[in-house]
Amino acid sequence: MTKVLITTVPFGGKDRLPLELLEEFNVDYLVNPLNKKLTEDELVEMVGDFDIIIAGTEPITKKVMDNAPNLKIISRVGIGLDSVDLIEAEKRNIIVSYTPDAPAPAVSELTVGLMLSLLRSVQLSNIEMHKGIWHRFFGKRLSEITIGIIGVGRIGAGVLQHLQGFGSPKILLNDTHSNYELSNRLNKKSNINWVDKDTIYQQSDVVTIHVPLTVQTKNMIKKKQLLIMKDDAVIINTSRGGIINEQDLYDVMQSGHLSGAAIDVF
């Protein structure tokens, strides 16, 4: 009987269909009993004789694989494989898959929601109201600002598409990979331009990050990049936590530079 370890959380909580499918095919499965993202050591203790891991973003390292002699498949739920040692998996003929399209619509919608929240001070107003403080904040309209999108893959392109419903904001794009189909489609739009990253940092009222975590993008945004942004700009990261240096972001915001940040990843 095939044994499956489900480490990603939550899994089957909102919809039991995935678990019912496993049961239908007589698959022996274990859902993460700790109900949280596992550390490397926790995964080492748990992985045992499982054949398949349905994984989240927990680190699946050589050490983990050493303790999983039967492991044949790592099925990553979500975008990005930076948490999996792909070289080690290839050496062991372990199949690695992922679901890049599944979370893209939700993350792109969340990103636009975070923009609106930051630009309208929704969260800050809510906090102050609960403290009995009545303070009127002046917001900004999306159609009247410049938005910089770094990374125009599935999620970045989704954000771009959603923004078309908010009038015609000026949009600056940057990506390490050429997207010729998207470029040709956007050539007719005068409010959208491809630029370098520094131009995005310097000219944008909102900077939103949608790149994978790699050696090249780790700590891509540090104090230097944050300080050339507008004083009242906001930054959003819904990609990977390691892309923005969090200590630098904290220090810069404590100094009064930047008016807000929305971080969905750590």
Positions of PLM-derived features:
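N-terminal glycine-/charge-rich "phosphate-binding" loop or analogous flexible N-terminal tail
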Residues: 1-50, 172-174
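Glycine-rich, N-terminal phosphate-binding loop of Rossmann-like dinucleotide-binding domains
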Residues: 8, 57, 78, 209-211, ...
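Structural motif corresponding to alpha-helix initiation and N-cap regions
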Residues: 15-16, 37-43, 58-62, 135, ...
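Rossmann-like adenosine-cofactor binding region
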Residues: 62-65, 169, 178-266
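Phosphate-binding beta-alpha-beta segment of Rossmann-like dinucleotide-binding domains, i.e.
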Residues: 92-94, 99-146, 150, 158-161, ...
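Hydrophobic/small residue at the entry helix of a nucleotide-binding pocket
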Residues: 155
